[in-house]
A protein has these predicted regions:
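Contiguous, non-catalytic segments that form substrate-binding/exosite surfaces or channel walls
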Residues: 1-74
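Second-shell loop/turn segments in exported
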Residues: 12-24, 77-81, 92-99, 121-122
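A cross-kingdom signal targeting lumenal/periplasmic-facing segments of multi-pass membrane
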Residues: 56-60, 77, 164-168
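Extracytoplasmic
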Residues: 71-75, 83-87
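A mature extracytoplasmic/lumenal domain signature
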Residues: 80-84, 111
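Active-site recognition of the HExxH zinc-binding catalytic motif
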Residues: 89-101, 105-108, 112-113
Length: 168
């Protein structure tokens, strides 16, 4: 369970402390998650570089991009101004490209699995948040609008976390 304030907003130290120490801790945790997953799936085993914030994150917002993997320098880059809850999954997503998983759906699934390896509830939440859109779309296709509306009432508390890009 992710701690929330009385307004339903997620409480997390990195939300107030956007220092390089907190972001470094988050990047280190993303690497640790991928390495834990690598113990289970040998294709994901090995060294991972530290995910780096993109200098042009504002441009990435305009393109609705959460990250970018640059294979020639082996850099996993993430959008530094996106909503905090999306950063763990975005970091793991970009790191999964390092292991040759170039298709976005594969990288998304690996990021989801990696985030669940963490003891940090924010990482776990980010992993679940990263796949909720796929689940909602599949539910709509399989069950229709009425069932979707009923399901959305159950997942209403996630609304605040569905924001990919911040306002500022």
């Amino acid at each position: 369970i992710v701690p929330r304030d009385e307004e339903g907003k997620i409480l997390y130290s990195a939300a107030e402390d956007k220092s390089s120490e907190e972001i470094t801790r988050m990047a280190d945790e993303a690497i640790a998650c991928m390495q834990k997953l690598g113990k289970r799936y040998s294709q994901l085993d090995g060294w991972y570089p530290k995910p780096k914030p993109m200098y042009f994150s504002d441009f990435m917002c305009q393109q609705y991009m959460c990250g970018y993997y640059f294979p020639f320098s082996m850099e996993a880059n993430y959008n530094d101004v996106m909503y905090l809850m999306n950063k763990p999954a975005a970091m793991c997503h970009e790191l999964s490209h390092l292991r040759g998983y170039i298709f976005e759906d594969e990288a998304n699934f690996i990021a989801y699995l990696a985030c669940l390896q963490s003891e940090d509830p924010i990482f776990q939440y980010s992993g679940y948040l990263s796949v909720i859109t796929y689940l909602i779309n599949d539910l709509y296709k399989a069950a229709g609008e009425e069932e979707l509306l009923a399901a959305r009432k159950l997942i209403g508390p996630m609304k605040e976390g569905e924001v990919a890009i911040t306002d500022g």
